[in-house]
Structures are given as C-alpha cells and as structure tokens.
C-alpha cells in the first residue's frame, strides 16, 4: 500500500496519570483509516517500559485499571523505551500516510498530544497541526441532541488499541446518527 495523504492516523496512549510533567506513557497504539473510516491497518501496540519508581507514582485508579488489564506486567517486561516505541510507530505510519498530512485522530486527543510533545516529539511532529477529536461531537450531542448518546456504548477497557477501535466506531456512529451525511 502506498502512503495516501487522505488517510487518517488514529492514536491512543495509556499513561500513568494525566500530568505530562510527572506521568509517563505506558502504552501506545495506532491505526490508519481511509477518509471514510474504513480501517486499513493496525499499527504496533507497544507497552513502554517505565521504572518501578515511576509506576509506584500511579494513583489508585491507574493502578487498578492498568494492573487489571495486564498492562503493568507488560510495561515491566517491555524492552521498548519512549524512543524505540516512537520510532516503531513512525516506521508503521510512513507506509500509510505522508508526514504532516493527517490530523491527530482520537478521543480527547489533546491530552495524548501533550504527552507526545514531551516524550515523543518526532512522532508528534509527524501529524498535521489539526485535531480530529471524537469527544467534540460527543460534547455537542450531549448539549444539542442528548438522546443520541444512548445509542453508542463504549467498553472502556483502557487498552490502547481497543480504545482506538471504539473511537473510530463512535465517529462512524455520530456520522450516521448526528451529522447525517
């Protein structure tokens, strides 16, 4: 497959918390869709190694969630640091989307971008400056047509690839039921 500037890059990170000055990325996943939200390829899902000291800083919610999903064990066993995960992700993306063409796509994606800017700046720079944030449509639906929200339920596994697939499906749902193209 050759890189196509109309393809969309979807990304999700799992982190030890929400503050990029204190917390770290522990999982990254990407996938690529065409402009019509058909999934073309799933990139690597990478647990990013962090020290025991860093993991010990997680709050109760993060400990419970990431231990329960098995992510903490995968992080401890991982040989990928931030840079290796960043480079592996970029190598995958180069096959599908030229640099600087796709907005960063996902749910509440501004939070992920803050972590990319700090810990994976080359990957952050691979994206266009624009955002395609599914949570924007969710917030608009909540205010303008709240009954729409009941039609889509997320599993909320807080595993990066699952979360991305849900974001794509959620946007497709809003396209059909809210935007009505």
From Swiss-Prot:
NCBIfam families per record: PRK05359.1
Record has Cytoplasm as a keyword: yes
Active-site positions on this chain: 129
Gene that this polypeptide is encoded by: orn
A single MF term (Gene Ontology): nucleic acid binding
Domain Exonuclease per the UniProt entry, residue ranges: 8-171
InterPro entries, A to Z: Exonuclease_RNaseT/DNA_pol3, Oligoribonuclease, RNaseH-like_sf, RNaseH_sf
Single Gene Ontology BP annotation: DNA metabolic process
Principal cellular location given in the protein's record: cytoplasm
Stated family: Belongs to the oligoribonuclease family.
Function: 3'-to-5' exoribonuclease specific for small oligoribonucleotides.
Compartments reported by the entry: Cytoplasm
Cytoplasm listed as a keyword: yes
Name listed for the protein in its UniProt record: Oligoribonuclease
CC terms in the record's Gene Ontology section: cytoplasm
Source organism (scientific name): Citrobacter koseri (strain ATCC BAA-895 / CDC 4225-83 / SGSC4696)
Pfam families listed in its UniProt record: RNase_T
EC id: 3.1.15.-
Keywords: Cytoplasm, Exonuclease, Hydrolase, Nuclease
Gene3D superfamilies reported for this sequence: Ribonuclease H-like superfamily/Ribonuclease H
